[in-house]
């Protein structure tokens, strides 16, 4: 592991987590629960199912609170007996919050917020000794000198828990930015969160389809800051790195991920590339995804660049392809191995007339 704050693999940091876990136990801030991870997951799953069916939220919260208090009821003798028997345990943090009280916190995107104090015990270490995100976040981000945490808004409900853990450990909490979720447009016109299984959520999708990194970055910039498009229109020759990015310009509501707009942005970006830049990007993509096409490009690079140069440059450069995949299909016309007649001539055409017509066209075509 390179860097000043390694090791970076969670499995290699077990001793570090356990040291801080012992501190919390000694401080009376944590306690063991002798249940397997499967049993804990079953409890969580049952809670979720109950929440979906039960509309009496107050009663449900009371039941969970009573179950939590019951978990805290144990003696040292009981713990020693469980340990002597070799039983595994999960380690819980004891929440000291009052849900009727509020914590004032500043989110760098959302401004000043008031959130309920944490009143639910949370798992710090699972029964295999591996920390949960809650605990690893506090320990790792402190030891690695993290000053700003940027994460999705789905973590806002956990913010009180994390602030509590930083306080328990005696650490200074970082500054937080909770960004809005990416949304996708459904067929019925509604919007929902972009899932990791949706097209566009995985960077491998962009590589496979042949989007140039510059195009994806350009599009993402339009999502990050509301004034980027206006700035870019006024500064068409400047790089995105020159843009005065402003956290306060980030949206609080979910922005819509639009593949069609990505295509428009990509076509515009590629239209400004030189033939050499297009060739290099196309070849890099073909080397990974289409070996035969890559071989044709390498065999005659000047010919490939000549094809790429068609309609490139000038005041109105061509904008009919936005990915290397689309460009490959376009270039198929110029290679014998991939040339295909899409619309064959009707059978009733006289062959001699066809030959005469083609000869006349070839003679008049100024290429």
Region locations from a protein language model:
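Aromatic/His-enriched, Gly/Pro-containing loop or helix-boundary segments
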Residues: 1-20
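Catalytic adenosine-cofactor/nucleotide-binding cores of aminoacyl-tRNA synthetases and other
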Residues: 169-365
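Short, charged/polar micro-motifs that form catalytic or ligand-binding hotspots
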Residues: 7-10, 152, 206, 252
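Active-site cores that bind ATP or allylic diphosphates and position pyrophosphate for catalysis
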Residues: 10, 23-26, 30-193, 202, ...
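Short glycine-enriched loop/turn motifs at secondary-structure junctions
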Residues: 2-4, 144, 200
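Non-transmembrane alpha-helical segments in soluble domains
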Residues: 18-25, 217-220
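Hydrophobic (often cysteine-bearing) scaffold residues that line and stabilize catalytic clefts
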Residues: 13, 17, 158, 212
């Amino acid at each position: 592991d390179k860097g000043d704050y390694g090791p970076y693999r969670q499995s290699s940091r077990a001793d570090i987590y356990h040291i801080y876990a012992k501190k919390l136990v000694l401080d009376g801030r944590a306690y063991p629960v002798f249940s397997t991870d499967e049993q804990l997951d079953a409890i969580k799953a049952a809670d979720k199912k109950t929440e979906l069916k039960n509309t009496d939220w107050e009663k449900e919260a009371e039941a969970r609170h009573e179950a939590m208090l019951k978990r805290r009821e144990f003696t040292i003798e009981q713990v020693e007996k469980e340990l002597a028997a070799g039983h595994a345990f999960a380690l819980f943090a004891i929440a000291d919050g009052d849900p009727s009280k509020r914590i004032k916190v500043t989110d760098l995107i959302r401004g000043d917020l008031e959130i309920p104090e944490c009143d639910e015990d949370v798992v710090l270490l699972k029964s295999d000794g591996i920390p949960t995100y809650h605990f690893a976040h506090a320990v790792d981000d402190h030891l690695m000198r993290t000053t700003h945490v940027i994460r999705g808004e789905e973590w806002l409900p956990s913010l009180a828990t994390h602030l509590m853990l930083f306080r328990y450990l005696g650490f200074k909490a970082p500054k937080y930015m909770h960004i809005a979720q990416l949304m996708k447009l459904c067929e019925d016109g509604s919007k929902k969160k972009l899932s990791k299984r949706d097209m566009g959520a995985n960077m491998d999708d962009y590589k496979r389809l042949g989007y140039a990194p510059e195009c994806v970055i350009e599009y993402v910039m339009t999502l990050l800051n509301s004034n980027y498009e206006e700035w870019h229109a006024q500064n068409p020759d400047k790089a995105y790195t020159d843009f005065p990015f402003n956290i306060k310009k980030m949206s609080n509501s979910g922005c819509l991920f639009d593949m069609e707009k990505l295509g428009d942005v990509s076509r515009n970006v590629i239209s400004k590339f030189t033939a050499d830049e297009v060739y290099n990007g196309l070849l890099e993509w073909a080397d990974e995804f289409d070996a035969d096409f890559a071989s044709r490009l390498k065999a005659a690079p000047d010919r490939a660049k000549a094809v790429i140069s068609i309609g490139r440059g000038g005041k109105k450069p061509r904008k009919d392809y936005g990915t290397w995949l689309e460009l490959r299909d376009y270039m198929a016309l110029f290679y014998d191995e991939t040339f295909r007649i899409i619309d064959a001539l009707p059978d009733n055409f006289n062959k001699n007339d066809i030959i005469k017509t083609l000869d006349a066209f070839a003679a008049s075509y100024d290429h």
